[in-house]
Regions:
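Conserved Walker B
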Residues: 98-102, 114, 130
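Clamp-loader machinery-focused feature within the broader ASCE/P-loop NTPase space
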Residues: 1-105
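Structural recognition of the conserved hydrophobic beta-strand(s) that form the central parallel beta-sheet
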Residues: 95-97, 110, 122-127
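Conserved adenine-binding aromatic site and its adjacent loop/helix in ATP-hydrolyzing domains
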Residues: 80, 112, 139
Length: 291
């Protein structure tokens, strides 16, 4: 079996759970007892503590603020582990999630391990945006793509009252669940109005900013960016020909914002204003706002 795999697809399709289950299968060996709980030969790299203060809180078992990216120190610590033998059997698995949020130095460091993987070591790179990985990393891994889910399947999981969530989930069960948990339907309705008719008076933009709230969490911002992109993607089919280029440009700008949001120190108020402006411009607004 190849040593490096990219698990690619939208957020909310079950890639993380699949990676954990696949890792269990990879490290299991006949006649070698396996631990029931956390496995010492399955290593998960994700967002670590933001700073020393957060690291102390994490060590004490307290809530802590996470970094916005996966850093080179985490990759180097993992590589130190690779210099030792696995604890239980002869194989180990490294899961990196989300791999597209590795800092550039971290990606370069990981590349060395992918080029010369230790015997019995497998890498599972979970990504919502495979294009965000270095081409050299992509070339050394095989890609397993997770397809979108159909509406009927999502509805079976979510039950009654989920139609609006399903319509804007873009085939992602996780996105539909977040839509319902975060009560995003009022936001979705304003976004659809902005994309359809613009906002020459700024009233809809003000309404959207009010619906989102003054201090949205990082997770809420990411869901709102996803929702804005889906809104534009769905609007282009019915848009007049003279508006389609504007929708495409606005969608590209939202994709760029979504890629930067986890690692850039954006002011949330300004970011929400920019999202509102991009939607309004796609709908034909004449004057953008930038906070």
């Amino acid at each position: 079996m190849h040593h490096g795999w990219i698990l690619a697809g939208k957020a909310g399709l079950g890639k993380h759970d699949f990676a954990l289950q696949a890792a269990r299968e990879l490290v299991s060996e006949e006649a070698v007892p396996q631990p029931i709980g956390e496995h010492p030969d399955i290593h998960m790299l994700t967002y670590g503590p933001k700073d020393d203060k957060a690291a102390r809180a994490a060590a004490e078992g307290k809530d802590y603020e996470r970094a916005r990216s996966i850093r080179i120190g985490q990759i180097r610590a993992m590589q130190q582990r690779l210099n030792t033998r696995p604890s239980v059997g002869s194989r180990r698995v490294i899961i990196i999630n989300p791999a597209d949020d590795m800092e550039r130095p971290a990606s370069n460091a990981l590349l060395k391990s992918l080029e010369e993987p230790p015997q019995g070591t497998f890498f599972l790179l979970v990504t919502h945006r495979a294009s965000g990985l270095l081409p050299t990393i992509r070339s050394r891994c095989r890609i397993l793509r997770f397809p979108d889910m159909d509406d009927e399947t999502i509805a079976r999981h979510l039950g009654a009252g989920s139609n609006a969530a399903i319509a804007l989930a873009g085939g992602s069960l996780g996105a539909a669940r977040k839509f319902m948990e975060m009560k995003l339907e009022p936001i979705a309705k304003v976004m659809q109005q902005l994309a359809a008719q613009g906002d020459p008076t700024l009233a809809l933009r003000a309404q959207l900013i009010s619906e989102i709230g003054a201090r949205p969490s990082r997770e809420r911002i990411q869901s709102i960016l996803d929702l804005a992109r889906t809104t534009l993607a769905q609007s282009i089919a019915d848009a007049p020909a003279d508006k389609r280029l504007g929708i495409i440009d606005a969608h590209a700008a939202l994709v760029d914002l979504a890629a930067k949001a986890p690692t850039y120190n954006f002011d949330n108020g300004l970011l929400v204003g920019e999202i509102a402006s991009l939607l309004a411009n796609a709908g034909g607004a004449s004057e953008p706002i930038h906070g």
